[in-house]
């Protein structure tokens, strides 16, 4: 085999170990898709001892099954997500998470640990959309949305209509991280939970020095 052929094989072998997050976060580690719980929304709330993490799939089997929702409390997001693996037979896969929803209390304490988790975790993606729930907890909102369809379906509908809404702009974890690195300030779409259990746009959460300091109308 020519030298170039060997180089291609070596690159193929070592790229998954190189930390190329953007390229390989979609690979499900050779597991069968049927044996995996593909989480699409992650919610993080503040507790007295650390955080509560709520993970939800979308609606399943073309609407025939409600979303699967898992919840764990731990001292860190990574510990809570790891504990979820013991809740069922399916492997909990976070590589399909498209939305990260933060409760207001957690956001006021600081959003940086949640963003750092996304940045460092091998499955999570930097293009994940970021939201702050105004006046409530992310986990409760995810549970309420599941009574209608799922948080994933509702947020994806808002994201698709973002160009048509004057009070809603998509923001990714990567974009907010870049803002914080450059000037310490940023803004994140705010949501409220409507009476019908639907997530609704509520302007923007204003972030200063990595923490929620107030709200702005869209």
What is the predicted function of each stretch?
Residues 2-10, 14-218:
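Membrane-proximal alpha-helical signals and transmembrane carboxylates
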């Amino acid at each position: 085999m020519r030298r170039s052929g060997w180089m291609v094989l070596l690159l193929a072998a070592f790229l998954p170990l190189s930390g190329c997050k953007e390229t390989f976060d979609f690979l499900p580690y050779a597991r069968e898709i049927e044996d995996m719980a593909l989480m699409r929304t992650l919610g993080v709330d503040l507790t007295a001892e650390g955080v509560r993490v709520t993970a939800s799939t979308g609606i399943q089997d073309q609407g025939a099954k409600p979303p699967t929702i898992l919840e764990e409390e731990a001292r860190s997001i990574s510990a809570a997500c790891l504990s979820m693996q013991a809740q069922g037979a399916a492997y909990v896969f976070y590589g399909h998470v498209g939305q990260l929803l933060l409760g207001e209390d957690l956001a006021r304490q600081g959003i940086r640990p949640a963003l750092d988790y996304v940045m460092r975790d091998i499955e999570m993606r930097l293009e994940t959309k970021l939201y702050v729930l105004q006046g409530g907890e992310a986990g409760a909102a995810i549970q309420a949305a599941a009574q209608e369809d799922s948080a994933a379906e509702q947020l994806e509908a808002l994201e698709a209509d973002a160009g048509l809404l004057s009070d809603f702009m998509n923001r990714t974890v990567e974009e907010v991280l870049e803002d914080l690195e450059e000037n310490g300030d940023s803004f994140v779409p705010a949501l409220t939970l409507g009476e019908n259990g639907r997530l609704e746009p509520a302007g923007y959460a204003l972030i200063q020095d990595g923490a929620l300091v107030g709200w702005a109308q869209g």
